[in-house]
Amino acid sequence: MSCRERTDSSCGCNGHEENRILKCVVVGDGAVGKTCLLMSYANDAFPEEYVPTVFDHYAVTVTVGGKQHLLGLYDTAGQEDYNQLRPLSYPNTDVFLICFSVVNPASYHNVQEEWVPELKDCMPHVPYVLIGTQIDLRDDPKTLARLLYMKEKPLTYEHGVKLAKAIGAQCYLECSALTQKGLKAVFDEAILTIFHPKKKKKGCLGCHGCCAII
């Protein structure tokens, strides 16, 4: 397990929360960039070497409302071979990040077909945030050529907002683990969701910046 200190967000907490160990679990199809997402955030650098299917549990010290908390980041494998083992990492989760790649339409559809049903079955009361990954590939020529060959296109921000509303996600955010664009906002939102989950009456759409960064 790796651990490093990070001052992430001031979420308007009332100051009476006891120091907590926070648990954030990332789920989604294989090859959508979950591991790189976590490693890039935890290490503040994109992994240049081979990335295993599941990386080690990382812990990051975050400051919320003037109090320090330990944020545990948990990777999961999206392949079907892990369907029986994956839920073993779910107990005591405070927030889930459901990931899909904006250049992998199948991973987008599987959010509603596979991942939300699994979470509702295993952890029905835990909030989740929808994350679009690999946004740096939206303009990548090789990626665009591959999608064109399959008669597909990259998914837009509007696609993510629509899906977030449909599944009752707390919020939709996009990021790139490679460039780190939007990366910190993803985990700021995860922390905010733990302390101040929103009711799912209409969902929370486009919540960029709803956490004050310090």
Swiss-Prot record:
User: Record's NCBIfam families?
Assistant: small_GTP
Residue positions where Cysteine methyl ester is found in the record: C211
Membrane topology per the entry is: Lipid-anchor
Summarizing the function annotation, the protein's role is: Plasma membrane-associated small GTPase specifically involved in angiogenesis. Required for endothelial cell migration during vascular development via its interaction with GLUL. Elicits the formation of F-actin-rich structures, thereby regulating endothelial cell migration.
Tissues where the protein occurs: Highly expressed in heart with moderate levels in lung and liver. Very low levels detected in brain, spleen, skeletal muscle, kidney and testis.
Q: Name one Pfam family in it.
A: Ras
Write out the entry's keywords from A to Z.
Angiogenesis, Cell membrane, GTP-binding, Lipoprotein, Membrane, Methylation, Nucleotide-binding, Palmitate, Prenylation
At which residues is a lipid of type S-farnesyl cysteine covalently attached? C211
Supply the InterPro entries for this chain. P-loop_NTPase, Small_GTP-bd, Small_GTPase, Small_GTPase_Rho
> How is this protein named in the record?
Rho-related GTP-binding protein RhoJ
Chain positions recorded as GTP binding sites: 31-36, 46-53, 75-79, 133-136, 177-178
Propiece span(s): 212-214
Q: Name one GO cellular component term.
A: plasma membrane
Q: To which protein family does this belong?
A: Belongs to the small GTPase superfamily. Rho family.
User: What does the PTM comment of the record read?
Assistant: Palmitoylated; regulates localization to the plasma membrane and may be mediated by GLUL.
Q: Name one GO biological process term.
A: regulation of sprouting angiogenesis
Q: Which GO terms describe its molecular function?
A: GTP binding; GTPase activity
Q: Where is the lipid attached (S-palmitoyl cysteine)?
A: C3, C11
Task: State the compartments where it is located.
Answer: Cell membrane
Report which superkingdom the organism of origin falls in.
Answer: Eukaryota
Self-association and partners: Interacts with the CRIB domains of proteins such as Pak1 and Was/Wasp. Interacts with GLUL.
Keyword Cell membrane among UniProt keywords: yes
PANTHER family for this protein: RHO FAMILY GTPASE (PTHR24072)
Where does this protein chiefly localize?
Answer: membrane
Pinpoint motif Effector region by residue range.
50-58
